[in-house]
C-alpha cells in the first residue's frame, strides 16, 4: 500500500484504512460455459456442455461424463486423517505481513508489533510448523519436490524499512528466511513524507543472508479511475478510464501498460539484486485473466493473492493468510493454521492423481472434474480445438509413453 502524506498522524490513519482494503482480494478469473463435441476412447461422439477456464482453456466436465468417455472410475473425496501433530501435508501455508513497529503508541490493526511477530515465529517452531525458503517453495510448486509436513512460507508486502530494522533481526534469531514483494518505484524514487521504504543496499545485504525480494509492480499499487463517475479499482487489474476520450482503455492498451510496468519492475530487480527467477504478489490481491497471461508471458510463474487457504500445486496463484493483524494474538494466529480441513483428493481407478491445474468443484449439484488432468493421469492424449469445441481422446501408444 502506498502512503504519501505530510503529517505523521494522517499517515498512520491511512495505514489503517488501506490495510482494511488490502485484505479484501479481488479476483476476476472465471469459467465460461462452452459447447463440446467429445469423441471418447470407445469412438462414440457425445455433444455436451462444459466449463472452460478462460485464460488457458482447461476443461471442467461432469464426473459421470468423464467416467463414460475415459472408461475409468473417478473419485473426489477427503484424504484420510493425518497423524496427530500433522495439520496438512503436501501443501504450504503462505503467511502475509506488511509493516512492523516497535512504537507502543502505534495501535493500528494492520501494523504488527515486532514483539508479536517474534512470538508468532517462536510458536510456529514449538507447534511443529516448518518455515521453508522461497527456493524450496519454487521447487515444490514447479519441480514436484517434497516439502515438510506443516510447511510455512513467510511473505511481506510493500517493502517497508521496518522489514530491515525489525523483521530481519527477528528472522535471523529464529533461523528463518522471508520474501518481500517490493513496489519498485518507491525504491527508485523515495518520497520524503512516505513511511520509509527499503533501499537497494539494505535489500542486497539481506539477500546475502537468504532473504528474497520480488515484484509487487513498479508503479501499479494504487486505485485508479475506471468510469466517468470517478469509480476506482486496482490499477493492475482494471481497464482504466481515459477522460480526454471519454472511454476505457482497450485490451491492447491494457496489455501494453501493465506489461511495461511489470517488465520494468523485473528489470530493476535483476539489475539491483541479480534476481534470476521471478514471483509476484498482486496489489490488493486483485487479478484477472489478462494479468495472469501477462505474468506468464514475462516468465513470472509463481503468483500470490490474498485468501484463507493453503498453497498447492493445483494452482501457481497461491492464497496467502493474513497474519499481520495485531488484533490476532500469536496463539490464535497459529491456531488458525491447524483448522484446515483435510484436502480433497482426485482418484482414478482408486489411484491418487496428482493435480497441476484446477481442482474438481461442485456446481449445480454436479461434480466437475479437470478433463486434461484425468487424461494425463490415464495416459490419454486429448486434442481440444477451443474455437470449434471439438475434443478427441486417443490412447498414448507405449512407444510415445516410454
Residue ranges and their predicted role:
Residues 2-86, 90, 95, 332-402:
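Primary recognition of N-terminal secretory signal peptides and signal-anchoring hydrophobic helices
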Residues 40, 71-152, 316, 320-347:
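N-terminal pre-catalytic segment of deacetylase/amide-hydrolase enzymes
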Residues 56-61, 111-115, 161-162, 197, ...:
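Soluble non-cytosolic domains of exported or imported proteins
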Residues 64, 68, 115-122, 126, ...:
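Solvent-exposed, polar/charged alpha-helical surfaces in well-ordered, non-transmembrane soluble domains
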Residues 86-90, 145-148, 172-175, 205-208, ...:
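Extracellular/periplasmic catalytic domains that process cell-envelope and extracellular macromolecules
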Residues 95, 100-101, 107, 151-152, ...:
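Metal-dependent polysaccharide deacetylase catalytic core of the NodB/CE4 family, i.e.
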Residues 136-137, 149, 153-162, 166, ...:
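Substrate-binding cleft of extracellular glycoside hydrolase catalytic domains
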Residues 288-330:
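Extended hydrophobic/aromatic segments used for targeting, binding, or gating
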